[in-house]
């Protein structure tokens, strides 16, 4: 069995911010997202006991974010170049996988391998007040999976599973422009963020449909956390960063 599909998503947003404090600030933000994706999957039961799976997927994401901030100075509004920015983000992910399923009298086995390549480019041109924040990031990872289930008596079973997974930073966390919550708290993205990679292992005893008891192990590298940086003047910048392993 072979199936294929394609998708397109378009999203646009606009937001105004008005902060009335010691320094009156007005922000005009807008942006758009274009997402293209396509995938194909093959399922081939080539014998009574074995089934082969294979597939490929590609996705392209393009994001354009604009933030224009102005401060009230006297009776006129003046642009704030420290906070304003125009950020373009492009991401391409290509992936392919293979998996083999095997079923015998008392043992079921699933073994797979997925290869992913990610290419990211972000561009934020600098100005006299703000340095260039453009960046590129390319990485390739292999993700093996394994699941073994052994059937016991009376519908009970033992299972052993392993999988390697990835959690990518979301687009907002990579965006270097500043989002103002209030006069004391600013949000700012981090273009140097790396994805989280985790290894997960579980051994479980399954008692029919009643309950499941297991032992699990997880190791995660480059965990993404929120950091809080005091910039003085009672202003705190909240920014994501990778926790050192």
Q: Positions of the model-derived regions?
A:
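Outer-membrane beta-barrel translocator domains and adjoining extracellular loop/strand segments
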Residues: 14-23, 65-73, 77, 121-130, ...
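Outer-membrane beta-barrel strand-turn architecture
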Residues: 44-48, 101-106, 142, 150-154, ...
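Face-selective signature of the C-terminal outer-membrane beta-barrel domain
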Residues: 1-123, 151, 211-213
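Membrane-embedded beta-strands of outer-membrane beta-barrel proteins
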Residues: 38-40, 96-98, 144-146, 191, ...
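Residues that define the transmembrane beta-barrel architecture of outer-membrane proteins
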Residues: 32-36, 90-94, 138-142, 197-201, ...
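Extracellular loop and loop/strand-boundary signature of outer-membrane beta-barrel proteins
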Residues: 21-28, 78-86, 128-135, 182-191, ...
